[in-house]
Amino acid sequence: MIKGIQITQAANDNLLNSFWLLDSEKNEARCLCAKGEFAEDQVVAVSELGQIEYRELPVNVAPTVKVEGGQHLNVNVLRRETLEDAVNNPDKYPQLTIRVSGYAVRFNSLTPEQQRDVITRTFTESL
């Protein structure tokens, strides 16, 4: 179990008023904020803190979501007509940039087959 603390008394003056997360299962403390010898995010054994007194602080832990094979969304704010015109008149659109698989790419640098694929995948009649 993890609990948040603020150290109110300690033999080491650098610990006074510092904030920590204590992990009772691992017997470790993670520094959130302290003066002197402890760095932010430094993890130490609880015993390294020595004799301390503290007050508990509320801790909100956001649940983590692990998704494999999750969803991916590319947003292109264009009209179908613009892309089709770029296929037929590439000189009019030298700077036209689109998102493909998370990367920005110049539309004119794609092969004609890739350009058609982008248009087909981007503009559908229904889901």
Curated annotation (Swiss-Prot):
Entry-annotated residues carrying Glycine radical: 102
Span of the signal peptide: none
Segments passing through the bilayer: none
One protein family per Pfam: Gly_radical
Domain of life: Bacteria
Gene Ontology MF annotations: formate C-acetyltransferase activity
Gene3D superfamilies referenced in this protein's UniProt entry, alphabetically: 3.20.70.20
Ranges for domain Glycine radical: 5-127
GO cellular component, one term: cytosol
InterPro entries associated with the record: Auton_GlycylRad_Cofactor (IPR050244), Form_AcTrfase_GR_CS (IPR019777), Gly_radical (IPR001150), Glycyl_radical_cofactor_GrcA (IPR011140)
Keyword presence, Flavoprotein: no
Keyword annotations from UniProtKB, A to Z: Organic radical
Function: Acts as a radical domain for damaged PFL and possibly other radical proteins.
Name the record gives this protein: Autonomous glycyl radical cofactor
